[in-house]
Amino acid sequence: MARKTLRARRFFSLIFPFFFITSVYAEQTPESAKTVTVEAKNEMFAPQHPDQYQSWKATSEQSAREDALAEDPRLVILWAGYPFSRDYNKPRGHAYAVTDVRETLRTGAPKTAEDGPLPMACWSCKSPDVARLIQQEGEDGYFHGKWARGGPEIVNDLGCADCHNTASDDFAQGKPALTLSRPYAERAMEAIGKPFDKAGRFDQQSMVCGQCHVEYYFDGKNKAVKFPWDEGMKVENMEQYYDAIAFSDWTNSLSKTPMLKAQHPEYETWSAGIHGKNNVTCIDCHMPKVQNAEGKLYTDHKIGNPFDNFAQTCANCHTQDKASLQKVVAERKQAIHDLKIKVEDQLVHAHFEAKAAWDAGATDAEMKPILNDIRHAQWRWDLAIASHGIHMHAPEEGLRMLGSAMDKAADARTKLARLLATKGITHEIPLPDISTKEKAQKAIGLNMQQINAEKQDFLKTVVPQWEDQARKNGLLSQ
């Protein structure tokens, strides 16, 4: 009886603040990104919102770099011919958003504004300067050109104006004033029946995160960001959308498969999981309310692992202790990891077997159904593994996608075995040594010494010029 009473008190202590918040913000009308005057320098808001600013700044403490390719060299083969085969680190704090996109080998080593391998769109989730440029130049103007064009303009790390209408009266009065600062995100939410200006408070909290933590692609000649949600947000829906427009991110250099590269579909996978279905938002788990030294509540902007603030996050809903929940999460993470590796092994073999089939004289017609299976298998695998935290957000959906990927990869290999047999090849296709990142990169023909040297020269010569120009133009604090 005492236990039930305690739970009841706890329930009402949680629910009453929610009713209060709803009433306070019920009359808020979020302003469109098109009407916001964007101030991109985050430190400008420190005097007005000191606790939020200092906690945001503390994301710089999340500085460790984890090399995903070194941890799992199979990825190099799966992404052969694509910049991700050069460099792929696991995510770290928001304070490194601009630094990391400059330093990754994926963005190349451009010498001029018209040089380099990637488009302007690659800045889109890195800085409030993006919203500023879209306001100044329009979307077509912003997306036009190469990534290097944005170097002197996009200089402030992901921050205040990415999620808040910092020019609004509501923000000046200390209210969140949430906004979608990217018009393409606004359109995507409308496509799934969630117009931002009609969404409830809790929906909006996750939608602002869903501007960036999503799957997207670069559309048309201008390489504009678009979310592939026209048919829905499930892996099969997005696959259907991409297939219908014959889109591919690149062609795998081994198998010649037109591939899809998933980005970071946290919004989609969260929506498919128990937290999303019950509207437990990104904010509830990753940005909880905490107290400052004076006992005042504020939203912690040091976005991180919910277990780091267990009492303010998980314990609000769960009765289990921290160790018990950590054990559950670890078991789910391991199950997804184990299936992930099995799928990768199948895909690695499929890419090399497809190469052997081409080398043996296979025709486009013979290879088409096989390449389609490889494309669909790797897409489903990638959407599962690119969603960092799927073991927490939607473990069942993660396992389902990986199981489907395994089936598709097995189909491809069965068809390849039959095709190879018609070419007189009945032995197992040997794999090169891909036991380390370096060996795998050598196996696909990457000259990493040259790539790294070019990048270091870029960082020493070009980036300082970008920063000097930004300071002269008043875009970056001295």
UniProtKB/Swiss-Prot annotation:
Keyword terms of this UniProt record: Calcium, Electron transport, Heme, Iron, Metal-binding, Oxidoreductase, Periplasm, Signal, Transport
Molecular function terms, GO-annotated: calcium ion binding; heme binding; iron ion binding; nitrite reductase (cytochrome, ammonia-forming) activity
Keyword Iron: yes
Gene3D superfamilies, A to Z: Butyryl-CoA Dehydrogenase, subunit A, domain 3, Flavocytochrome C3, Chain A
Binding annotation for heme c 3: 94, 209, 212-213
Signal peptide start-end: 1-26
A single BP term in Gene Ontology: nitrate assimilation
Superkingdom of origin: Bacteria
Chain coiled-coil ranges: none
Cofactor note: Binds 1 Ca(2+) ion per monomer. Binds 5 heme c groups covalently per monomer.
Binding residue positions for heme c 2: 160, 163-164, 301
Xref: Pfam families: Cytochrom_C552
CC cofactor: Ca(2+); heme c
Pathway in which this enzyme or protein is active: Nitrogen metabolism; nitrate reduction (assimilation)
GO CC annotation, single: outer membrane-bounded periplasmic space
EC number in record: 1.7.2.2
UniProt-annotated binding residues for heme: 122, 125-126
Reaction(s) catalysed by this chain's protein: 6 Fe(III)-[cytochrome c] + NH4(+) + 2 H2O = 6 Fe(II)-[cytochrome c] + nitrite + 8 H(+)
InterPro entries noted in UniProt: Cyt_c552, Cyt_c_NO2Rdtase_formate-dep, Multihaem_cyt_sf
Entry similarity comment: Belongs to the cytochrome c-552 family.
Protein name according to UniProt: Cytochrome c-552
Gene: nrfA
